[in-house]
């Protein structure tokens, strides 16, 4: 069967060739190896037509140019040589486009990422739209890879080595105006005249490359380059803790191209691409990418979602303010906040103002757009304006009677179809719905703080929640830009349940004499964004430890915190960053001062701060308990699948993405090895390390999680 055309060539009367990119049946244009023959055939036609004056690449998709290469191609490669051959094919194709004797212009609207930007870089000029959907970047590092079709060589020469390194090492995406300022594009225009401007540019001589700023020219020279790569290398090593091999290879490949010329650079790029594609880190990061894409397509239930036209929020605190912001500014839905105190409403409104004003200051948003988004948020101290809200999110104090009262008030003051979604982090949803007239419309919707930054939400139906309520709540979470996982209504749900033993063990090691900074550094080295003690300080010691007695009551002794430690800390008025003192001491608000461990913490908890454990031993104790609890959650069907378990841990806790999540990590170690480690730890430190039955059985049978299908919740 012949492949449908992805690249279509049309020659206009003014002898400008328009190449339209449109992958049939797909929302996004992605590049595949099998498209190469089509592109080569078009290049041949372009070379043969001596009348042509220029070429323009444009997308037929409404919101993307090319979103990147199809990642499945890499998964299909069995060896580094096969992946390297893919990169060389891409490089060759881009070189052929660049070698055309007439001007070639990329007309960019929407996402222009990865292989899409590499194609645009191979063109002689680039024009993009001023639309917010238009972003340009090379995000391959987020998949444990580097740009493999010439991006590591072309970008530094176009915009300068230090700017290019920042883009390639972080996967940072640029908006149109930023791209113009850096010289990545030649013009930014309204969408309506994009093609017209690109055609006019194609009629001129090839756009001459803009001279680089003096700083960039110095940094490209031998002395500047040596200094730059040394500094960037140090900074990158500190940030990645050596856990992401792609960053090291990016530096090596870019430097090779600058020092030895593009031919050596392209060769190094293709070779590094092939080798990185085979690393366990890249395989894990790609698995997270596929799993999150899969979760985003999951409707949550078989029922169709109800319409969502407006939302109400109860409580104007930190969580209420954050939820209002993502509902209005990401989902674009009108939001009405109810708080018993006008100050609460003002606080919530200021939260959105601060977020949007920050964007205006950074020139990511126009002031008029800020005002338009703010106009979606209103407040009240009673239920006026709540009568026709489709969904109410409750974000009041963690008090069961108060939340039950909120359910009763919403049922009395809102419509018969209104859904009540509680942002509780610890109370059973079934208990919150216990006295509801319409319990089928009560559900949990657990956000993580800070709401605008944390990508995960847990959606928690109780036994009586309807399928439509689940589907509607999932729909809202996606509109808010969140990745939702549906979890069972059991104490701690999923994320807090696997996090609690991890933090408990860190506190226990403190009481045994380990130092605060040693414990935190060990887990950062392992791959977490912050250590467990710092995390507790950031969340708030009072807030973070509130769930421990709930979990201990539900699951027993393995969740108990070291005796009297938490109460001693809280009785000493230590809440963490929010009041300036926890395990660490913080400088005055508004001043940039480094946090420091408070030495007074050790006598307070009856410890010496003179531990003997190595960093791997510290990490092992915390992480093994988290893995064991995650397996219990699959076994008890708290999560619907290991996919959701991995996504929940990576997006909700910051479990190291390069390990792929708890279940991928268990698979990489082998269940038998995890059981052996836990049995050793149980002998040394106590029964809380006893591996759960499911893990022991899988170890004995040599089974893996990702090769077995987790049973869906009924």
UniProtKB/Swiss-Prot annotation:
Q: How does it assemble?
A: Heterotetramer of two alpha chains (FadJ) and two beta chains (FadI).
List the gene name: fadJ
Q: Where is this region: Enoyl-CoA hydratase?
A: 1-190
Q: Which pathway features in its UniProt record?
A: Lipid metabolism; fatty acid beta-oxidation
* UniProt-listed CDD domains: crotonase-like (cd06558)
Q: What is its EC number?
A: 4.2.1.17, 5.1.2.3, 1.1.1.35
Question: What coarse category fits the chief subcellular location reported for this protein?
Answer: cytoplasm
Query: What is the official name of this protein in its record?
Result: Fatty acid oxidation complex subunit alpha
**GO-annotated molecular function:** 3-hydroxybutyryl-CoA epimerase activity; enoyl-CoA hydratase activity; long-chain-3-hydroxyacyl-CoA dehydrogenase activity; NAD+ binding
Q: Name one GO biological process term.
A: fatty acid beta-oxidation
For this protein, the record's InterPro entries field holds: 3-OHacyl-CoA_DH_CS (IPR006180), 3-OHacyl-CoA_DH_NAD-bd (IPR006176), 3HC_DH_C (IPR006108), 6-PGluconate_DH-like_C_sf (IPR008927), ClpP/crotonase-like_dom_sf (IPR029045), Enoyl-CoA_hydra/iso (IPR001753), FA_oxidation_alpha_subunit (IPR050136), FadJ (IPR012802)
The answer to whether the entry has keyword NAD is yes
Compartments, as annotated in UniProt = Cytoplasm
Q: Which UniProt keywords apply?
A: Cytoplasm, Fatty acid metabolism, Isomerase, Lipid degradation, Lipid metabolism, Lyase, Multifunctional enzyme, NAD, Oxidoreductase
